[in-house]
Amino acid sequence: GFCQMARNVYGLDLGSYDIKVYDKKKDTIWKEKNVIAFKDNRDRDIFAVGDDAFSMYGKAPSNIEITFPMKEGVISRFNDMQFLLQNLLKRGRQFSRGSEYVIAVPTDVTEVEKKAFFDLVIHSTAKAKEVNIVERSIADAVGLNLDIQNTKGIMIANFGGETTELSVLAGGGMVLNRLVKVGGHTFDQGIINLVKHSHDFLIGRQTAEVLRRNFNVFTGDSDSILSVAGRDLITGVPMRKPVSIMLIRAAMKDPLLECVKAIQSLLDRTPPEVRKAIYENGIFLTGGLANMPGLEIYIEQMVGIKSRTALEPDTCAVNGLKRIIMSKDLRKLTFSMIEDNYRWMR
C-alpha cells in the first residue's frame, strides 16, 4: 500500500563530532557537526545546530552556549541528541516518518549506553517503524569491502573525535574489541597545552586541528614551521607566532603511544590463528582521524603489521550501513533491541 512507498530507511553513524547519515530514498550520504548552540535563557532556546553551531565554536558570545551531545563515543545529553538528530533529518530533506533505522554503535560500552542509541529514534517524533543496531566495526568492515563472513582474521582501528575503537573480526563476528579514550580532541588539547607552555601563546581548537592536519607528524622534515594566529598570554595581544613541527610531534607522542599499546595488547589477547591472519591481512584504519599524515606508516613501524587507510575513512562506517541496508544477505549482521513486551507497550 501507500505506507510501504512512503517509508524510508536511514543509516546513522553518530560520532562525537560528526553525524553521518545515509538516506536510502535519496541515495545520499551527508555529514554534519554533532553540535547545538543554545541561548543562555531559561528555556534554552535553540540558536543554531550542526555546522552552523560549530562555526561559532570558540567565538560565540557569552549568552550562547555550545554543546556536544556525545561524549567519548556515547550519548551524554540524550534530549539534546534527540532534538539535533530530528532537526537535521527534517531539514529540507523530505523527512519520512515511520521509517526504518540502522544505527552503528560502539561495542565496548554498556548495554544501557547501547540501548540509548535505539531509544533515540524509537521514542521520538520520528515514529520509527523499525530500529536495528549494527556494531560500528562490522559496518566499517563492510564499508571497506572486506569479506567478513569468511575472513580468518582482520583488525580495524577507527580513529574518531574522542575515541579510538579497535576490533578484531573473524568468521563473520567480533572476536575482541576495545574502546580507547583517545581521539582528535586528545591530540588537539595536547597541542594547545604544549604551545601554551612553551610559547606563552594561546591557540584555539580549530588552529590546533589545522596544525594536526598539516604537519606530517611522523616522517618528513623536522624543521618545518607554520605561522598561526593566537593570543600572547603575557601581553594579552592577538598575534601570529611560528610553531615548529617538532613541538607538534612532541604533543602527539603520548596519545599515539597509548593507541599503539592498546593495539599491541589486543593482539596479545587474540587467539594465535586469528593473529596469524591479521599479520597477513593487515590493520585497516578508518574514522575521521585516519587521514592524519603519516599515521599509517607510524602504526606499521610501531606494531610491525602492514596498515592500510580506507579511501574515505570518515564515511567508511556509514558506507557500510548503506551496503547493509541494500543487501538482504548483509541485513543478518544487524540486530534489534526490541523486547517482546515492547510492541505491546506502544
Task: Specify the residue positions occupied by each region the protein language model found.
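A structural feature that tracks compact, well-ordered secondary-structure segments
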Residues: 165-167
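Nucleotide/phosphate-binding catalytic cleft detector across ATP-hydrolyzing
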Residues: 1-159, 169-283, 290-317, 322-346
